[in-house]
Amino acid sequence: MSSRVLASRAAQPLKRHPTVVGAGDEAYPTPRRCFSSLHDRTVNQSADFSSTSKNYDRLGRRAKEKLLDREFFMSLLNSASTKREAKSYLARLKAQQPAKPQKKLQSTTVQQTIAESLPSGVNLGSFYGASRSVYQSPVFRQDSTPAPAREDIPERLHLALVKIKTPQLLDDSTLDGVARTLSQINRLGLACCVVVDPGSDGDTHTLRKIATEQVGRIATAVDRQPDSKSSHLYSVLSFPAKRPDIPTVSSRKQLLSPLRDGHILIVAPIAYTEDTPKALMVPANDAVLALTKELAGLATMPDPDEDPMITAQKINDLQKEVSLDRVILLDPLGGVPAFRGPQTSHAFINMDQEFEHIERELLQVRNPANNSQGESVVTNPISDSNAVSESASTEPTSTPAKQALLPMSVGEDTIDGHLDNLRLSQQTLAMLPSASSGIITSPVEVANSARSLESSPSELSVGTRRQRNPLIHNLLTDKPLLSSSLPLSRRARGSLHLPAPPTTFVKRGMPVSLIPDPRVQVWTAQTRPNMNLDDPHVDLPRLVHLIEDSFNRKLDVKDYLNRVNGRLAGLIIAGEYEGGAILTWELPPGVEDDGSESSTARMVPYLDKFAVLKRSQGAGGVADIVFNAMVRTCFPNGVCWRSRKDNPVNKWYFERSLGSWKLADTNWTMFWTTPDLPEKPQKFRDYEAVCRSIQPSWAEDTGVID
């Protein structure tokens, strides 16, 4: 049935006409040609025929399938930042599909041998050929015996572990939206294992009853979704006799079988004792940790008498079976709030860098009496595990008015809930590969963004775009909804289509090294470090590789070292040289570097190189980590840099800078984060002069006009 027929019927009432019945479809009246505006056709088609509308049952089977596909791909495209990201994910998903084995290869060998022995072009049947028994009889050969065909190795299962807290407090509409999102995630190739968290209000019997009821309720909501099936388990966890206080997974096969069959698995936090079977309630967080340990392949108890190499191989084989890619915490509290600094929430948390700082911040809000009266800044150690440097990220405390409101507006239970989510995310990601990530958001946020096209505005109507689904967006992009390096003014909720409550994207992350350590020596023109890029603390070959890989150009290392050595302000290195920044102090042309106060005052903080490895670009938050360290810790009073006018990264720079200026008669655009720079004419001219005068240090001419 064509969309024109649907649109015409929805646009205006029609008189009865003879009906035309097609195979597999219902009977529909054949309408006369009638015309309506394109706007009316679009709106009514979306409203009258959606998977949740009353008219949905009137559609034929093929029409229903097309409509469901349309809703699925519309949700897919709206959840990605760009169509390129959605296309990229679909390409990765297609690449994961194994090639079909050639089952008929062996059976065709005999037929091919017979055919080759016969005269070409003539089918003489079996009369002139040898009998089948001759071809199939054993033959003595000195050739090596072909190895038997190896059974197909099961495809690696990509999995998301989801915890839903207090689903009994969610209405049916919200739960249906969550189930719709889980169904879409499952369709995108990420199997879902859901753990029900009934909370802690009530005795053991009451909580067990609530958990059992909610498992069935969630299963019903999942089964209502098109092409979606659920399975639920009540006995997958157990308490071993040796460790009666720590739950473990009793059967790995029982856990993985429904997931491999494409079912959404729902687990109740109930464990059974091994010695005398008895059902006991388990804290949902402990259940999540037990499942994570099993799915990560770390639950195997090594035999002391077994060869360590054999034990390692067993663990490796288990890890090849399953890839736990996401740990999703759906909590009515939403993401992790921020009580210090200008931001109100954490869009992205780099656990290696920020966990202890955020945990301490939440504890200070929970117990304000324990805070020191004279505290005015919060110290954020950039990398406790890095031997080269540790940085103190100093952010101003919140305003007195904000501090006064915190104890009244935020209760201890709320802070405890956020602490539990933060710690659970840290503990689970610590057991998983660095590529895995976590999401902390609210069920309401997921349900609202998963609404059907029925409630969506017309594509032609005036308004903001549909709200992105945080779970699908993260699956497609491996990035948070809002970049953590965006200025606060560009992260504020200006419309109803930004997340509220916030969503927090969590990665195990990477350490960040700042050289020199700003906590020991602040980066100022008066305290320039006496260091060069060939300093022992700097791995120069890896730094050069980072720059060349990021810019896709060969660096003239000797010329570059001659230019920046003696001018260095410092270096920012993320992880194992996955990203970094080189910052210098530059003097405008004509100003003599004589060490005087007037000369030092004219020095410009300049971002000379900002680089991220290609494999880390666009995902993982490496660029955000480096940029945040630069503007919040190293140069909080401002820094400038330049970029080619046609650089595709300029959009990213525009969003994060406080201003930009196209340099006339050049191919450069100048950016800065210095507050009120246009109101300071001398400093502005110095910034412009520096950006104009610096000469590139590339080894060959690639045709790029600098």
Swiss-Prot record:
Residues 389-401 have a biased composition (Low complexity). Residues 1-25, 367-403 are annotated as: Disordered. Residues 527-696 form the N-acetyltransferase domain. Its EC number is 2.3.1.1. Residues 367-388 have a biased composition (Polar residues). Pfam families: NAT. Gene3D superfamilies: 3.40.630.30. InterPro entries: GlcNAc_Synth_fun (IPR011190), Vertebrate-like_GNAT_dom (IPR006855). One of its GO terms (cellular component) is mitochondrial matrix. Keywords: Acyltransferase, Amino-acid biosynthesis, Mitochondrion, Transferase, Transit peptide. One of its GO terms (molecular function) is L-glutamate N-acetyltransferase activity. PROSITE patterns: GNAT_NAGS. Pathway: Amino-acid biosynthesis; L-arginine biosynthesis; N(2)-acetyl-L-ornithine from L-glutamate: step 1/4. N-acetylglutamate synthase involved in arginine biosynthesis. PANTHER family: AMINO-ACID ACETYLTRANSFERASE, MITOCHONDRIAL, N-ACETYLGLUTAMATE SYNTHASE. Belongs to the acetyltransferase family. This is Amino-acid acetyltransferase, mitochondrial. It comes from Emericella nidulans (strain FGSC A4 / ATCC 38163 / CBS 112.46 / NRRL 194 / M139) (Aspergillus nidulans). The lineage of its organism: Eukaryota, Fungi, Dikarya, Ascomycota, Pezizomycotina. The gene is arg2.
